[in-house]
Amino acid sequence: MRRLNGPRVLQLVLKEAPYIATQDGDKELEVRSDSRWIRSRLIDAGTGLVREYDFVRYRLGYQAGAPCTVCRWGGTVWCDEDITVGPYRNGFRRTFSGGVWVIVNCFFRRV
């Protein structure tokens, strides 16, 4: 979690197709397979509770100067069921099996 002028910001990197769907406002959910890495960002190690954020900042890849999209964080939930996101206008679609983390995006704005 990184603070930008005070707000709590979850920073995530996306590949091109999911980034465009998020930037366009089509993709209201960010789904991540369960892993130690994503749990370290979503779960407070001290309390074991889901962390709360003000914003989610999505970055297109790792290159310097990569475009970013910021949206208001709408919550994080655990889902034990298979889930499919998409298809979106740009054709992106993905199915996740088993336990996944679902991050709700709200109020998109471009940065």
Predicted regions: what is each one?
Residues 2-111:
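Structured alpha/beta reader/binder surfaces that contact nucleic acids or chromatin modification marks
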